[in-house]
Amino acid sequence: MTSRRKKWGAAVAVAIAASAMATTTQAAGAKPAASKQGGEISVGILNTISGWCFANALTGDALGATRMVYESLVERDSRGRFIPHLAESWASSEGGKVWTFKLRAGIKYSNGEDFNAASVKQNIDIGRGLTSAPGFSTRYASTGIGINANIMSVDAVDTTTVKITLERPDNDFLGLMYRAGRYVMRAPAQIADPNTCSTNGIGTGPFKIVSYNPNELVVERNPLYWRKDSAGVQMPYLNKITVVVVKEASQRAAAVRKGVLDAASFTTGEATFVKDLQNRKSVVTEYAGNAGSWGQWVPNQNKAGSPFKYQNCRLAAAFAINWPAYNKVRLKGMGVYSGSIVGKEHIMYTRSGAPTYNLAKAKEFVTKCNADLTAAGVTTGFKLTLYADTSTQSLNNTKEVQKYLEAAGITMNPIFQAESAVLIASIYRGGGNLYDFAEGTPAEGPGSGYVLPFFVTGAFPANSTNPIAKTPFGIGYNKVVALGNHSDTQVDTLLYAAQAETNATLRKQKFQAATAHIQATGMAIPTLHTATYTFVNKKSKLKGIGLLKNPDGKTFAPTRDIKGLEWTGVWQER
């Protein structure tokens, strides 16, 4: 824990004890100003903001913090549908093999540089590992190389038109271009300097950075922002937002309850404190997201010495974990257990082949697993290590899972704890995941676009003609997003056939067949689907949350996404 965070934690504790209201809020009796513009607020989050460049993998509310600065071509509306944002429209051709995006004209990055087709091409080309792209640095190699493996070329047709050609047809390509809110556009000036790229985020978004370290971000209103409200007032409305990392949910909850923080985000894993805040309706307002972060634990099959090389070991773990009980004990029933690696509304949903909790079966498979290991010369038996974030809630949640595995006869090492940013970097690294499991994946959303990449044998199929596949980066990152690190090419055959299918009924059937195979072989264990929750102190008088109209005129409910609130249209009554 850094000294900066210790100081913040101490400050929160003192403020909670000394005050019932944050210094950034207005007195309850104050009259609202005629203008919506102005105001400064503070927001508490769980996850460390590890950085702003291509290689910085962020999750949940840390991702949401960076989205104050960054924007993407594609967004989602209140119903989860993909809608235009920096792009004003798109069209697919050649059966989903070519995608053409028309960009909005006249947009600038916060430093004054033009947002245009050349900039979009630069961002996508660097993200996919094209070393000849302007500004490319070896430091920019990232999971994007695997995620973008199906992209063969990116062409700037004119200033506002970008054409993306794929190796294989993909009728869910918009899901990949959204990428759970991660597919953001960075300014050329940020990309130009690899020494500062991770600390100097420059985007087209409503705010720009004033100061930044991994545990505290201060942003101010971007005067060059391109959006106006229906009255012609330039957005955003707020002048400044301070985002602080408060690891302990107890402190974060107390801070937003007392008004030390104007708003704070929470995960389903922090259910004890979410439930408590839900019961304080006179003090805070809740903005809850959909349970669209798909619960998937993925056994790492090719980690050196991993018992998960053997299907019996994978199925032993799958049958051992009592997810419904875990949901009741640790998540207070707030998780959603669909019995599948995706939710019931998803095109890939099926319970076929999925193991469900059965201790007797788990013990049978543990015996078979140990026999497999003994035959392979392993004398230590079935042994695993789980990991947890440094927060108390994360550790206690992991202990509950470990208890179920031990009950089935699996030997468990001490839980490994590290910052979430460290864990993410160790899972999504060149050469593959360092841990026995990927205890969850970034997979989310209504389509297969940001689900499929995590289950194929590698980012690039064996017969790929993509020139990046044979480069050191293509080889090094081929297994990064394929979290199971497996070699079952039947998964590829099933998923790619479904991806290319244009008949809606057949497409769903093909995706379900792929899911059934993944579940039956223990390649991914169905767990609990979770959401993000944001609570706002009522004395902060924040208005307009969830009411902002998108550029296409649709109401956007950003609380539905894992990244939390959309702050562009939020204003403070004064």
Question: PLM features: what roles do these ranges have?
Answer:
Residues 44-94, 125, 202:
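N-terminal lobe/hinge region of extracytoplasmic solute-binding protein
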Residues 46, 130-139, 210-220, 242-305, ...:
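Extracellular/periplasmic solute-recognition and catalytic clefts
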Residues 88-135, 157, 163, 252-255, ...:
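Aromatic- and charge-enriched surface segment that lines or borders ligand/interaction sites
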Residues 178-236, 240, 565-574:
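Gly/Pro-rich hinge or "lid" segments in bacterial periplasmic/extracellular proteins
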Residues 534-574:
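Long beta-strand-rich cores associated with HINT superfamily self-processing modules
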